[in-house]
A protein has these predicted regions:
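Primarily recognizes the serine-hydrolase "nucleophile elbow" in alpha/beta-hydrolase
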Residues: 107-154
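Short N-terminal helix/helix-N-cap motif within the alpha/beta-hydrolase-1
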Residues: 32-33, 146, 201
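Alpha/beta-hydrolase-fold catalytic nucleophile elbow
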Residues: 54-55, 112, 136-139, 161, ...
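C-terminal catalytic histidine-bearing segment of alpha/beta-hydrolase fold enzymes
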Residues: 175-220
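Short beta-strand/loop motif that positions the catalytic acidic residue
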Residues: 160-162, 166
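Serine-hydrolase catalytic machinery in alpha/beta-hydrolase-like enzymes
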Residues: 2-108
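Short alpha-helix in the alpha/beta-hydrolase fold that links the catalytic acid
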Residues: 37-39, 170-180
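Short, proline-enriched alpha-helix->beta-strand connector loops that line the catalytic pocket
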Residues: 107, 153-158, 184-187
Length: 220
């Protein structure tokens, strides 16, 4: 298992020790330095939150400056399920390490993902021993849910946001994820940004902000 190192971060605006942690998981070929750009849009509403955006443990083979949670050599459902499963232990270990470091619990934690990072956030977040406060997923998809029917899993609230013009991850992925999460009894809210490609827009940022504030408050 590859270890995830500390990456980009934004300390609590309050200047005090963190009372919450928001972990942002970037997309394929990107890095935490890119996704941490979301944090300043939310920091004023979550002044006691520590924002962490670690790099994935693998260098991206096709984009030498970026990182990947796993290699996207195949895009069928079984390959995606295997990929998320292979990368999950490193993410879980990173989460556990940070919660222990700051004396916090899963209720104090929110996960945010973009694209491949959304796949990781959903995979790991649904399989924690205790529910995180919430999961926000931008422009991603849900993988490997069949196994959940045969084991215990947690049901944190989920927000999924997707652009209708996404050329990388088709918008149908959101609709499929919503259907599957509802079938599993996971509370899910979705939003489609009309005309948006593989990106996060101002509406998505605001929705993420509002969701995180409510989720972290209600989890305590």
């Amino acid at each position: 298992m590859s270890k995830i190192v500390n990456g980009a971060s934004l300390q609590p605006r309050s200047g005090l020790a963190p009372k919450q942690i928001v972990i942002l998981l970037h997309g394929y070929g990107s890095s935490g330095s890119d996704l941490i750009a979301l944090a300043p849009h939310w920091q004023d509403a979550l002044p006691d939150a520590l924002f962490l955006a670690p790099p994935a443990p693998q260098r991206c083979g096709t984009m030498s400056a970026g990182y990947q949670w796993w290699a996207l050599s195949e895009l069928n459902s079984s390959a995606l399920a295997a990929g998320t499963a292979s990368a999950a232990p490193a993410v879980t270990t990173f989460i556990d390490r940070k919660l222990e470091q700051y004396g916090l619990t899963d209720a104090d934690l929110a996960l945010v993902g973009f694209s491949q990072g959304t796949m990781m956030a959903l995979h790991v977040g649904l399989r924690r021993s205790r529910p995180v406060s919430g999961i926000v997923g931008y422009s991603g998809m849900l993988t490997a849910t069949t196994e959940l029917e045969h084991k215990d899993f947690v049901k944190p609230p989920v927000l999924l946001v997707h652009g209708t013009a996404d050329p990388v991850v088709p918008v149908a992925a959101l609709q499929s994820a919503e259907t599957e999460l509802k079938r599993l009894g996971v509370p899910v809210t979705t939003h489609l940004s009309d005309g948006l490609g593989h990106n996060v827009d101002a509406v998505g940022l605001q929705l993420g902000r509002d969701f995180l504030v409510e989720a972290l408050a209600q989890a305590r």
